[in-house]
């Protein structure tokens, strides 16, 4: 017993001694974490250079765009062929996809050899061979009469301009077919197909094997965004943000980037870690000086690096008693599978003995231990290097997502990763140390890269059909210049009808006289109260106007909320609430006492009979208070003041918010004679010649007309541009059938139009995996601020997804792109319609005055105009295109319509005083 223990101890000591000797001899091949982190940073820099238009030509890591922008979502259908060419074995698959069946993916495949003479022959010979094999496969499967879509996994560096257009940059993996480099791969295939003439095929997609691996995984795991090959060769791909790819393909979405990381170090940047064995092997390789990283990592080259180490050690008398056999000197006699066999835990040393015997080597137990440890060091270096470069990709993904911790899935394929007994464990362990802030799930590719090529093709087919249906739906929102000119013409007709006495009652655009005949002249002076009611929030203001050499306006205000139950309760409750808020404000300012002049901004359609009398025509914007329509709102306010018996008010003017906005801007800019609101609602006003205002006596000077253009189209004159989505939104609005133009423009309804389109697309399976969530069913979820945020140019898709998440909508990257597209189409139509309306207004002013050219300023207010990143630009452009004889400037109202009401009140008090004197 003691003797056995001593013997075991002796062999353990012997083994440890041999290991230490090998460690010392190959010390330079062991890489510290510090070195690996440095390599990680070098690769990260090379990735950035490869994605840059300026640095890409000189970058060693080419970061090739694949034009694969989407991964499978599980709804793909169809019958596809996949070709998988990347080594001495060539595979053809038939992949049938139907998500409605128990087995959503059914595959049949055949493996064909690619002889050495074909690999090193001409390009035409190679592709003739590929098509001969495909013909044989189709014959066997009895599908030669079908023209099936084909996905081609072509595992060599290609420069792609489309998903089906790929130019071969260079051969790798011992391929050297002449006349193929620099040519389009699909054209070479098509040429070979035509030459055969016995069948046809539609090449839809060309993908790298790494891309195929990643896409194959995407069908099972939506978190998969990295593909990794560690086998005969090595490479990685990942989903990059388009905004980070500096080649002008847009900012929205992602694209799979084929890194071609095997070229890392071809510029000499890895010479500090490349050793004499790497350099010696390079000289005898098919492509000396190229693929330097791959030659330190991949299985094809690992076997030769190990062999060269053994030869050198034998030459130095450190192994095999200095004897070298012809087999040991011959490339290909020692394989990667031998490395894997030698590194097995239990039978590794036994396998080493058998393999060395096969190589004709007389070996001792020490030799076997040494050979095993050499294999360990070389394969460990490979695992460490791959961990470093993958770590750089993971860090880039994390940075792109601006997240402190990354969660992602990596799909892995390759014989070295799959069959080596220690490789994956070592690789994972190193990766965890290098990127501790990433949670990575590794999924092994079971079906190879061919299925991935078929899935890319299936995705392309799905996206093409989805794109067709999406465009068909959104086309109804895209308005041509001719259509916009027609809208302008029809609105102008309605304006003329509204101004004439005999047709006013039939006009949808009421063209309401405001009885405002003058803008401030600078002599106004005093303290004025203003109320601003037009939505769920309303303001009470104290406005102090001082005239003199330097006119000033000082404002104090407080915002109050109107609960929904009061908005839709009784009129008495509404006005009592308003007066209660006024009372609070007077106490807040310490001015409850003297009877103060007040201007009332009342942002609803009113028929005015004087500056201080307005009869409510109809509620809009969600208000439904009873016993108000048909009544004078000033009287309702005065009655509420009397009921409270705390203070008195001198209500001088009731004005629309649009009129108030125009007055606010006119105080700053005298050429301002048009007002525009584009916010919760939409409306416009302008200064009309009194001779055209038949509803009011007098032909002198001008009067501001409150158009109430939101009702344009209520008579059906705009039905040809209304969509089914507009009709649904109108049907469920509080005042169905009314305010049709406003419903297509204003912020309160744009979100509803978007929501209904998204529901339709979700039902069709284009969004949110076809699942209509409870939040998506909720009316009003898409507020104007969310539309504005989603359409921001500066907002990355990740942030769009965060906004949708905030709304309770779990989205993919593709979902976010489509949501952003829908928002853009709906808001663009709104801006164009608003522009067409404004063009009609300024053209009328120009024609009224008989001018060849009009210079005019429009005062604008409203959250949609102010906050939306695209609305104002599109609207301005539309006005310019539709009214080319008008120079229109837009002035943003900074102080809102409340200030305008106070200014109108000040003008009214001034005119009242002048009238009393006269």
Curated annotation (Swiss-Prot):
The N- and C-terminal halves of this hexokinase contain a hexokinase domain. The catalytic activity is associated with the C-terminus while regulatory function is associated with the N-terminus. Each domain can bind a single D-glucose and D-glucose 6-phosphate molecule. One of its GO terms (cellular component) is mitochondrial outer membrane. It catalyses: a D-hexose + ATP = a D-hexose 6-phosphate + ADP + H(+); D-fructose + ATP = D-fructose 6-phosphate + ADP + H(+); D-glucose + ATP = D-glucose 6-phosphate + ADP + H(+); D-mannose + ATP = D-mannose 6-phosphate + ADP + H(+). D-glucose 1 binds at residues 155, 172-173, 208-209, 235, 260, 291-294. Residues 208-447 are annotated as: Hexokinase large subdomain 1. The modification N-acetylmethionine is found at residue 1. Pfam families: Hexokinase_1, Hexokinase_2. This is Hexokinase-1. Residues 16-458, 464-906 form the Hexokinase domain. It comes from Bos taurus. Coiled coil: none annotated. ATP 1 binds at residues 30, 84-89, 425-426. Residues 73-207 are annotated as: Hexokinase small subdomain 1.
């Amino acid at each position: 017993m003691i003797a056995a223990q001593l013997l075991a101890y002796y062999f353990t000591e012997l083994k440890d001694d041999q290991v230490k000797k090998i460690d010392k001899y190959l010390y330079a091949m062991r890489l510290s974490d510090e070195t690996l982190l440095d390599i990680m940073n070098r690769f990260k820099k090379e990735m950035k250079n490869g994605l840059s238009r300026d640095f890409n030509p000189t970058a060693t890591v080419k970061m090739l765009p694949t034009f694969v922008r989407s991964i499978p979502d599980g709804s793909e259908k169809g019958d596809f062929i996949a070709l998988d060419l990347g080594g001495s074995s060539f595979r053809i698959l038939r992949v049938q996809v139907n998500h409605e069946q128990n087995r959503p993916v059914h595959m049949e495949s055949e493996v064909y050899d690619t002889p050495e003479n074909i690999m090193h022959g001409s390009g035409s010979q190679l592709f003739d061979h590929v098509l001969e094999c495909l013909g044989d496969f189709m014959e066997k499967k009895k599908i030669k009469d079908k023209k099936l879509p084909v996905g081609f996994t072509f595992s060599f560096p290609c420069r792609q301009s489309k998903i089906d257009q790929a130019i071969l940059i260079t051969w790798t993996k011992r391929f050297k077919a002449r006349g193929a480099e620099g040519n389009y791969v699909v054209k070479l295939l098509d040429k070979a197909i035509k030459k055969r003439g016995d069948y046809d095929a539609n090449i839809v997609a060309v993908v790298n094997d790494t891309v195929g691996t990643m896409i194959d995984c995407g069908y099972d795991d939506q978190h998969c965004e990295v593909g990794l090959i560690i086998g005969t060769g090595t490479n990685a791909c990942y989903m990059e943000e388009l905004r980070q790819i500096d080649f002008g393909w847009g900012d929205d979405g992602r694209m799979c980037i084929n890194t071609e990381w095997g070229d890392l170090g071809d510029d000499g940047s890895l010479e500090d870690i490349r050793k004499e064995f790497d350099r010696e092997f390079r000289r005898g390789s098919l492509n000396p000086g190229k693929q330097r990283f791959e030659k330190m990592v991949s299985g094809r080259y690992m076997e030769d690096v190990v062999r060269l180490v053994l030869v050198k050690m034998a030459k130095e008398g450190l192994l095999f008693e200095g004897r070298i056999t012809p087999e040991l000197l011959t490339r290909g006699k020692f394989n990667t599978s031998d490395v894997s066999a030698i590194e097995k835990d239990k039978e590794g040393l036994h396998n080493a003995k058998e393999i060395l015997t096969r190589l004709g080597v007389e070996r001792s137990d020490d030799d076997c231990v040494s050979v095993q440890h050499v294999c360990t060091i070389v394969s460990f270096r490979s695992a460490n290097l791959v961990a470093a470069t993958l770590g750089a990709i993971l860090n880039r993904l994390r940075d792109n997502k601006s997240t402190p911790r990354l969660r992602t899935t990596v799909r892995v394929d390759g014989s070295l990763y799959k069959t080596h007994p220690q490789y994956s464990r070592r690789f994972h362990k190193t990766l965890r140390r290098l990127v501790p802030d990433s949670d990575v799930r590794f999924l092994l590719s079971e079906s190879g890269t061919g299925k991935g090529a078929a899935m890319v093709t299936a995705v392309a087919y799905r996206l093409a059909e989805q794109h067709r249906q999406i465009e068909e739906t959104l086309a109804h929102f895209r308005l041509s210049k001719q259509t916009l000119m027609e809208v302008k013409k029809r609105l102008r007709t309605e304006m003329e009808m509204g101004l004439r006495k005999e047709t006013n009652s039939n006009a949808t655009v009421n063209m309401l006289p405001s009885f405002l005949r003058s803008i401030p002249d600078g002599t106004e002076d005093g303290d004025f109260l203003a109320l601003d009611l037009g939505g769920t929030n309303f303001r009470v203001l104290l406005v102090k106007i001082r005239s003199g050499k330097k006119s000033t306006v000082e404002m104090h205000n407080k915002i109050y909320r109107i609960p929904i139950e009061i908005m839709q309760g009784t009129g008495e409750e509404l006005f009592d609430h308003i007066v209660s808020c006024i009372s609070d404000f007077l106490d807040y300012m310490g001015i409850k006492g003297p009877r103060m002049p007040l201007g009332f901004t009342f942002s609803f359609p009113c028929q005015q009979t004087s500056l201080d009398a307005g009869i409510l025509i109809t509620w809009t914007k969600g208000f439904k208070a009873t016993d108000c329509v048909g009544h004078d709102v000033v009287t309702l306010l005065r009655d509420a003041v009397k009921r409270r018996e705390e203070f008195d008010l001198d209500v001088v003017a009731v004005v629309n918010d649009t009129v108030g906005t125009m007055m606010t801007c006119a105080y700053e800019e005298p050429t301002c004679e048009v007002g525009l609101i584009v916010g919760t609602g939409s409306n416009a006003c302008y200064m009309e010649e009194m001779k055209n205002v038949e509803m009011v006596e007098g032909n002198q000077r001008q009067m501001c007309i409150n158009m109430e253009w939101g009702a344009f189209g209520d008579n059906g004159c705009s039905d040809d541009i209304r969509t089914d989505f507009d009709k649904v939104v109108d049907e469920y609005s509080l005042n169905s059938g009314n305010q049709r133009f406003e419903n297509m423009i204003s912020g309160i309804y744009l979100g509803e139009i978007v929501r209904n389109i998204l529901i339709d697309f979700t039902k069709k399976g284009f969004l949110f995996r076809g699942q209509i969530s409870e939040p998506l069913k909720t009316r009003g979820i898409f507020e104007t601020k969310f539309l504005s945020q989603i359409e921001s140019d500066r907002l990355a898709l990740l942030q769009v997804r965060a906004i949708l998440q905030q709304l309770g909508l779990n989205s993919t990257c593709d979902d976010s792109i489509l949501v952003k597209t829908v928002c853009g189409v709906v808001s663009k139509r709104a801006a164009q319609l608003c522009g067409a309306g404004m063009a009609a207004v300024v053209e009328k002013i120009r024609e009224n005055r008989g001018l060849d050219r009009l210079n005019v300023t429009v005062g604008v207010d409203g959250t949609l105009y102010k906050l939306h990143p695209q609305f104002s630009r599109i609207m301005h452009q539309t006005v310019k295109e539709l009214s080319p004889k008008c120079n229109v400037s837009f002035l943003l109202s900074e102080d809102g319509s409340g200030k305008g009401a106070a200014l109108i009140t000040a003008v009214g008090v001034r005119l009242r005083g002048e009238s009393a004197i006269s």
